[in-house]
Amino acid sequence: PPVLDDRTVRLSFSAAGTLGDIGKTQLEISSPGHLDLKADAAAKNLLDANRMEASARFEGDFRDLAFLKALLPDTVLRRRVAIPALIRLRGSAGADRGTFSTASTLSADGGELSVKGRFNPREQSYDAAIRADSFPLNSFLPADSLGIVDLALQARGTGFDPLLPRTRTSLRAQIDRAEFGGRDFGGIELDAELDSQRLSGRISDRDEALRLLLSVSGTLTEREQRIGLS
C-alpha cells in the first residue's frame, strides 16, 4: 500500500537449539520514529503440548502510527478510530506442562490496561484478571462519546458448560469509573458464582439516581434453566 512505501523496517531474528528444545530466541523489529519491539523466548519439549515448558518476554513502543488508519477498508471506520501518539506494551507469556499463562500491560495517554491469566485446556481450568487504570477509551474511539475507565474484572473456574454439575465459576466486576457522554456511570459492582448447578450473586450501583441492589439466584441444569432477581 502507498502509505507504507516510505516506511523503513529493520528486523533481526536469532535462535539457538533444536526444533524440540530452543535454548534462546531473540526478535527485534524497528521502524525509525514508529516502532521498537523486542522479544526473547526459550522452550523445551516444544512439540509436545503436555510436556512443553516455554517462556517469553516482550516490550514495544509504538509512535505516530495514525497513518495505519489508511489501511482500514471502511471510510466510516477510519473516521471513528484513532491511534494515540505513543502506545507502550510490556508483557510475558509462558507454558508449563499444559498450562498456559500471560501477563501484559498496555499504556497510552496516561492510562493502563493490564491482562493476566492462566488457562489449562485439558483440565478446562482458567483464572483471568483484567484491570483498567484511567484507561482512555476516547483516545481510541473519539467519536463514540466514551471517556476514562477504571475497572477490575476477575474470573476463575473449571469447566465451560454451565449445565454440567462439574462446572464451577466465579466472576467479580468492579467499575469505579466509566465515562460516557461527559457523565460518570461508575460505581457498579457484580459478584456471581456458579457451583453444583446453583447460581448466586448480586449487582449493586452507587449512582444516586439508581441506588441499585439486586440479588441473583438460579438453577442451571439440562432440564431446567431458571434465573431470578430480587
Annotate each PLM feature.
Residues 1-230:
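Interface amphipathic segments
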